[in-house]
A protein has these predicted regions:
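Glycine/proline-enriched, intrinsically flexible loops and inter-domain linkers
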Residues: 1-272, 276, 280
């Protein structure tokens, strides 16, 4: 799992870009004492000419090329959910989120099946926008992703943008040994599509926990599932992890978009954290 190109370390590439220009960076690209936990979303204070500000811009992205190749509808919907979840994981809110899409598809060549791919993707993204009340206000598209017999996978990358206060931003590396860690996830239907009422309940619960200062670190589960989340959260401070429950391989590696792995602050009552699907207590 860790060796997958979508999951493995991209530190060498990331460090080619200067993340400190303007001295407004809130979250560096890698967190923790050892700077090995990748940050899922960008957070930087807005530049001002005079004085100081704590107003912080946040931006996260979402895209699963494998899911999109199987079903552009599922892929686009999940991209929107993933991008917004990453914003929430570091302290944002979905109610103050705006989207921009980057779309890239094969040449349609007047083929109804090929035309169906961008149509399906746009319907999936539209469904997510309507359900969450987050509109896409910009983007860039191309329908030239074909070279001879090679086509790009159906591509709709979602970027979610929001604002928060710098003091509310949460980084993603585990902070200390002995913390309680929970998994909160929404419900999904028989077609593996997220239940949006359940998803909004999850989003609101995570936002409330962060706003109340009850979260030490938070990770929006994405392509690599819970296993990716736990591994990368552990790297930054070299804190190990032990599961209290036995998880199946499917539960460990399944990409459940809209789910969160959360390290709780000391003294948080787990019985008060309840949504439609029971939380799963895990421990460091």
């Amino acid at each position: 799992m860790i060796s997958n190109l979508n999951i493995c370390s991209q530190k060498g590439l990331i460090e080619r870009f200067d993340s400190t220009i303007g001295a407004n960076t809130v979250l560096m690209p890698f967190g923790g004492k050892y700077q090995n936990t990748p940050t899922q979303a960008m957070a930087a204070k807005l530049p001002v000419l005079h004085g100081n500000t704590k107003t912080t811009s946040i931006m996260g992205w979402g895209y699963d090329p494998y899911l999109s190749s199987v079903s552009p509808y599922h892929g686009a919907m999940s991209a929107v959910v993933e991008s917004i979840a990453k914003v929430i994981a570091i302290g944002g809110t979905y109610e103050k989120c705006w989207l921009t899409f980057q779309e890239y598809f094969e040449r349609t060549q007047n083929d109804p099946e090929r035309w169906g791919k961008p149509m399906s993707a746009l319907l999936g993204a539209y469904k997510a926008q309507i359900e969450l009340g987050c509109g896409s206000i910009g983007g860039k598209d191309s329908m030239s992703g074909t070279f001879e017999e090679i086509d790009v996978p159906p591509t709709l990358v979602s970027f979610a943008v929001s604002v928060t206060d710098a003091d509310k931003v949460v980084s993603q590396e585990f902070k200390k040994a002995g913390s309680k860690v929970i998994l909160i996830k929404p419900e999904y239907d028989d077609n593996k599509l997220v239940n949006f009422d359940s998803l909004k309940a999850v989003f609101e619960k995570v936002e409330k926990l962060i706003a109340e200062g009850k979260v030490l670190s938070c990770w929006a589960v994405s392509y690599g599932g819970v296993s990716e989340a736990v591994a990368k959260m552990a790297f930054g401070n070299k804190i190990g992890f032990k599961f209290t429950d036995k998880l199946t391989a499917e539960e460990l590696y399944r990409a459940c978009y809209g789910a969160f792995v959360i390290e709780l602050a000391e003294g948080v009552d787990l019985s008060l954290i309840h949504i439609s699907e029971p939380t799963r207590p895990l421990y460091i």
